[in-house]
Amino acid sequence: MIIDLGNNIKLIRPEGKAMFPYCNSVYIDDEIKTLIDAGSGGNAYAQIPKEEIGLILLSHSHFDHTHGLDYFPRARIMSGMEEQFAFQDENKFYITAGFQRWEELMGSPKEEKMTSQTPLPDDVLVKPGFRRVELGGVFKDHDEIMAGSIRIVALHTPGHSAGHYGFYFPDQKILFSGDLDISPRGPWYGGFDSNYGDVIASVEKLIALKPEVLITSHRKVFYQDIEKLLREYVQIAIDRDEKIMAFLDQPRTLDEIAGQELGFYGLGKTLFNIFWSKVMILKHIEYHIQAGEVEDLGNHRYVRN
C-alpha cells in the first residue's frame, strides 16, 4: 500500500502488518528517487520503479530495515556513521545483538533461531544475520541530504540502537522517527548497544521539532497529538524504570526483577522476548549505576543506594 503524503513524499506499507520481518519505508518520488529503509518486502516494492531508485537511507542496521536492499541494484546506500560497522565487520555486528550473553542471562545455551519462531515470507530475500553491504556514504547528526528538490535532515536518535537515525523533512514538517515507533508496548532497547537514557533524550529531541506529520517504522501515519503520543510512548519506559527502582529497595537478582510485571510481553513470552526483557532491565540498572543510584553486588544482584 502507498500512502501519498504530498510533495512527492509517500509511505510504503508492507502487504502484511508492518511488524517483523517488515517495516514501513518512505519513498521520495523526486529527481533523485530515494527510499528510507528497505524492509517493506518485495510485494510492496512492486508498486514503485525499483530500477530507478538512486539513493537509500537506512535508519539503522536491523534486519527488518535492510533485507530488501537487493531489490534496488542501482541505489547508493547510506547509513549513519555510528553504525556503518554493522555492514562491514561481522564480529562487531553480532556483538551488538548481544546473543553472546544468552547463556549468562537465560541459564542455558541458545539453540533456537528467530526464523524458527517467525518463518520468513517469500518476498523477504535474505535471512537474518550479517551481510556485507557496500555503502556509498555515511551521514551524521543534522546532515542535510537532498533528494532532488526535497530536503531531508538526518537526526541521530540513539537508544534503540547506538546508530539509530530519524529523518526530518523541514519544509513539509514531516518526521520519520524509525523504530521510536509509538508502539503501545513502549520503546525497545534490548540490544547490546541500546541505551535507556538515550531513548529518553532522543524522544525529547523529536518532540522539540514540533512535526505536523509523524511516520514510524511499524505504525500508521499520525497527524494529530504528536507530542502527546511521543510522551505517552516514552512514559511506558519511565514507568518501568520507577517500578524497577522501587523493587530494588533490598538486594534483588535479575531473575527476581524480571519476574515482576513490567509490561514486556505484548508479543508473548517467547524465549527471545524473555531474553530481550532481561537485557532491557539491565539497561535500566546500568543507567542508575552510572548515576550512582544503584549498587552492583555481583552475580546479577543489585540494590538501590
Please name every model-derived segment:
Residues 8, 28, 37, 60, ...:
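Divalent metal-coordination and catalytic microenvironments
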Residues 21, 42-145:
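Active-site HxH/HxHxD metal-binding segment of metal-dependent hydrolases
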Residues 1-49, 165-180:
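Conserved beta-strand hairpin/beta-sheet module of binuclear metal-dependent hydrolase folds
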Residues 243-305:
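C-terminal regulatory/interaction regions
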Residues 40, 127-128, 151-241:
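Metallo-beta-lactamase
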Residues 5-13, 122-128, 148-150:
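Short Pro/Gly-enriched beta-strand edge/turn motifs at strand-loop
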Residues 34-36, 57, 77, 174-176, ...:
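Residue-level marker for buried hydrophobic side chains located in beta-strands
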Residues 27-29, 36, 43-52, 67-74, ...:
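Alpha-helix C-terminal capping segments
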